[in-house]
Regions:
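Short, C-terminally biased terminal segments at protein or domain edges
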Residues: 1-135
Length: 135
């Protein structure tokens, strides 16, 4: 395949297209009347669409926003797979979740790389006071 757009060069984009192909095969045998069928189809489609749109944005804030939406869609797909297993529509979803784990990890990397504008807080000890603090 000849690369025509910058987002097509991203490994995470290619992996998300691979996941869509995996989902298409999976959904072939699942009743279209199940809401989770449509939800998984839409959420899986949302991943590469948001990666492509985010990669085309000019500001880091915009790029991160779309990459974060794509990450959320990947997590939504993982939950859809759990629902399909719970409803005994599929026996297991390990191979799909492995693809999703790679997608999420790559998106987190992209978000961290482009999020120079974000303020990162160190974890705080909420609700407890250190001995002698403020006494």
């Amino acid at each position: 395949m000849k690369v025509a757009f910058d987002h097509e060069k991203l490994d995470v984009y290619q992996e998300s297209i691979r996941f869509i192909c995996w989902v298409d095969e999976l959904l072939h045998d699942i009743p279209k009347t199940l809401a989770v069928n449509n939800q998984l189809d839409r959420a899986s489609t949302s991943i590469p669409l948001n990666i492509a749109e985010g990669n085309g944005k000019y500001t880091d804030a915009d790029r991160c926003r779309f990459f974060d939406i794509a990450r959320g869609s990947a997590l939504e797909c993982a939950a859809c797979l759990d629902v399909l297993v719970a409803r005994k529509q599929i026996k297991q979803a390990d191979s799909g979740k492995e693809i999703l784990a790679r997608i999420v990890a790559m998106l987190v990397g992209l978000i961290r790389h482009t999020s120079s504008y974000r303020v990162h807080e160190q974890s705080a000890d909420c609700g407890t006071r250190a001995a002698g603090a403020g006494d």
